[in-house]
Protein backbone atom coordinates (compact mmCIF):
# COMPACT_ATOMS: atom_id res chain seq x y z
CA UNK A 1 0.00 0.00 0.00
CA UNK A 2 1.39 3.37 -1.02
CA UNK A 3 1.66 5.61 2.03
CA UNK A 4 0.89 8.66 -0.13
CA UNK A 5 -2.50 7.10 -0.86
CA UNK A 6 -3.19 6.76 2.88
CA UNK A 7 -2.71 10.52 3.22
CA UNK A 8 -5.58 11.28 0.83
CA UNK A 9 -8.14 8.48 1.30
CA UNK A 10 -10.76 8.75 4.02
CA UNK A 11 -13.47 6.60 5.52
CA UNK A 12 -16.55 7.00 3.31
CA UNK A 13 -18.80 6.94 6.39
CA UNK A 14 -17.20 9.46 8.77
CA UNK A 15 -14.49 10.96 6.52
CA UNK A 16 -11.92 10.00 9.17
CA UNK A 17 -8.37 8.77 8.73
CA UNK A 18 -7.75 5.16 7.67
CA UNK A 19 -4.85 2.97 8.75
CA UNK A 20 -3.35 0.09 6.79
CA UNK A 21 -3.46 -3.45 8.19
CA UNK A 22 -0.84 -5.28 6.11
CA UNK A 23 -1.53 -8.74 7.59
CA UNK A 24 -5.25 -8.68 6.74
CA UNK A 25 -4.98 -6.45 3.65
CA UNK A 26 -7.54 -3.99 4.97
CA UNK A 27 -7.91 -0.27 5.56
CA UNK A 28 -9.17 0.36 9.09
CA UNK A 29 -11.41 3.14 10.39
CA UNK A 30 -10.98 3.09 14.16
CA UNK A 31 -13.79 5.61 14.73
CA UNK A 32 -16.46 3.51 12.99
CA UNK A 33 -14.76 0.14 13.71
CA UNK A 34 -14.93 -0.77 10.02
CA UNK A 35 -12.37 -2.69 7.97
CA UNK A 36 -12.40 -2.07 4.23
CA UNK A 37 -10.89 -4.87 2.11
CA UNK A 38 -8.04 -4.42 -0.34
CA UNK A 39 -8.67 -6.69 -3.34
CA UNK A 40 -5.89 -7.23 -5.88
CA UNK A 41 -4.15 -4.12 -4.54
CA UNK A 42 -7.23 -1.91 -4.84
CA UNK A 43 -8.98 -0.52 -1.72
CA UNK A 44 -12.72 -1.21 -1.80
CA UNK A 45 -14.12 1.80 0.07
CA UNK A 46 -17.77 0.83 -0.07
CA UNK A 47 -19.69 0.61 3.20
CA UNK A 48 -21.53 -2.61 2.20
CA UNK A 49 -18.14 -4.27 1.56
CA UNK A 50 -16.72 -3.24 4.95
CA UNK A 51 -16.38 -5.68 7.81
CA UNK A 52 -17.50 -4.56 11.27
CA UNK A 53 -14.63 -5.08 13.67
CA UNK A 54 -15.06 -6.75 17.05
CA UNK A 55 -14.43 -4.78 20.23
CA UNK A 56 -11.10 -6.61 20.69
CA UNK A 57 -9.75 -5.72 17.26
CA UNK A 58 -7.78 -2.60 16.47
CA UNK A 59 -6.58 -1.82 19.96
Swiss-Prot record:
According to the lineage, what is the superkingdom?
A: Bacteria
Q: Name one GO cellular component term.
A: cytosol
InterPro entries, sorted = Trm112-like
Query: What family does the database annotate?
Result: Belongs to the UPF0434 family.
Name the HAMAP family on file.
UPF0434
Supply the name of the protein: UPF0434 protein VIBHAR_01537
Native organism: Vibrio campbellii (strain ATCC BAA-1116)
